[in-house]
Every structure is written in C-alpha cells, then in structure tokens.
Amino acid sequence: VPATFGYKVAVWIDELCRHVERLQGCEDRVFVAMLGGGAGTLASLGEVGLEIQDLMARKLDMKPMTMPARTTGDHLCEYVTVLGMLASTCSKIGGEVFTLMKQEFGEVEESVPPGTVGSSTMPQKRNPKLAQDIVAVAA
C-alpha cells in the first residue's frame, strides 16, 4: 500500500516530538548534582552536607540527588537510553531518505550547492551525502 512522502515526514515528526517529550521529562532525574564525598554519604561535610549539596545544585542549575550516593548511575543510563532512541530515529530517517533517493525511486533528492556537482562521475546525479552522514553519525 503506497504512502505519500508527506505522510512519512509526519510520522518522523511525531516520533521526534515524542523524543523531545522524553528528554524534557527526564531532566529533573538526569541532571542531578552528585556530591557525597569519598563514600557518597556526605559524612565529611557533617550536618551541613545536604545543605551544601542543595546549594551546589542550585549554583549549577541542577537538582540535588534525593539520596546522595557514589554507586548510582541510573540517571545517566536513562539519559543515554533516550539519546540512543533519538539516534535510532535519526538513523531510520536518514536510511529512508537514502533509499528514496535511489534512481529506482527518485522520490526525493538533496540539494546541491551552486558551483558543485552531485557526483564526480555523473554530474546530473545527486548523491545522498547528508542522508549518509546522518546514518553514520547516529550509529
């Protein structure tokens, strides 16, 4: 069943918007000030440990850790996971554009800046350079 290019782009935009929502939704959990001393217990800072952590977090425009610790990394894992999902979507988009640029389909093409050629052997051809770059960078 055929689908228009506009429909494909709408699906991409919808998926990218969900990634933006995910990134915004995890900000308070991900960007936390990790302060706790050698063992992560704030013991070396005594009774003012939590207060110092809160002050440091405010200065860095971050949230303080709810439970200071050195061995937690779930906040970083969450961030990397969301970025991985975003990279996967970008790779998918680049791959689809790459395929749609093939001569068999010819549905889309990348613009070629004035004064340059699209291909070293066939000047009329448009190589999917940007689409390839997106796939490579997202990998």
What is the role of each PLM region?
Residues A3-A139:
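Internal glycine-rich alpha/beta core junctions
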